Amino acid sequence: MDINNKFKNTKSQFIYKSGLLSGYVAHRLDNNQNIKRYLCYPTLNPLGDEGLKLNSEIIQQRNITESLLDRYIFDSMFNESMEELHESQIYIHTYRGRSDGEWGEIYIAINILIPLTYEKLANFGEKRSFAIATEIEDMFQDICVAKDNAEKHLIEKLGNLKFKIMQFDNGRLSKTNNVVVNTIILKTGVSTTRLEW
C-alpha cells in the first residue's frame, strides 16, 4: 500500500489560507467608514460633515459608499522605491507563516502610507496614520471572527479566526521622500489539517 494514499483527494490548507487572509483583511478595512474617510478626505477633520483642506477650502464630506479596493486599499505589497505619494493608501499582504504540524501561525502586514502633508489632523497631536492604525486595532485586536459576524464566503474557507497585533512600526518610507509609513503586523492561527477535496 502506498503511504501517500491517505492524502489522495485532500488539499493542504496552510498556504492556501495564507493567501486568502490578506484579501479578507482588505475586505474588512473597505467596510470601515472611518478608514474610508481618513483615506479619501485630505482634510484636517475627515470624520466631520464638512472638512477643512490645507488651503482653507471647506468641502462636504459624505459617507463613502463605493469600494476603495484597488484605489486606496490594496491586497498587495507596495513599491518601496516610490518617490511620491499624492493620496493616502493602505497595502495588505501575507508577511510570513509558520507551522508545527496541525496548527500554523500566519502574519499579515498592513502598511498605511500617508503623504506627510496630510499626516496632521485638527485635534492636537493626532496623526492620520495613527488614527487609521487605531481603527484597525479596534477591528482586530483579540476579536474572534466567526460565521455570525463576518463575510460568510471567506470565513467558510478560513474557519473561525482570532487576530492579535504583534507589533507596529512608524517612520518614513525613505530619507529622500515625505511619505509616512505605519506598519502593523497581525497574527492569526489556522488549522493546517488536510481537507477532503
Language-model regions: role of each:
Residues 1-99:
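Small/polar-rich, solvent-exposed N-terminal microdomains that initiate assembly or binding
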Residues 7, 120-127:
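Short, flexible/disordered intra-domain loops and linkers
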Residues 90, 106-110, 182-186:
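Hydrophobic residues positioned within well-ordered beta-strands of beta-sheet architectures
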Residues 96-98, 112-118, 188-194:
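Beta-strand elements of well-folded, non-transmembrane domains
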Residues 98-104, 174-179:
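Short, solvent-exposed beta-strand/turn "edge" segments of beta-rich domains on protein surfaces
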Residues 103-121:
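Short acidic, glycine/tyrosine-flanked loop/strand segments centered on an H-E-D-like triad
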Residues 129-191:
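Acidic-leaning, charged glycine-interspersed low-complexity segments
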Residues 197:
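Long, contiguous binding/interaction regions
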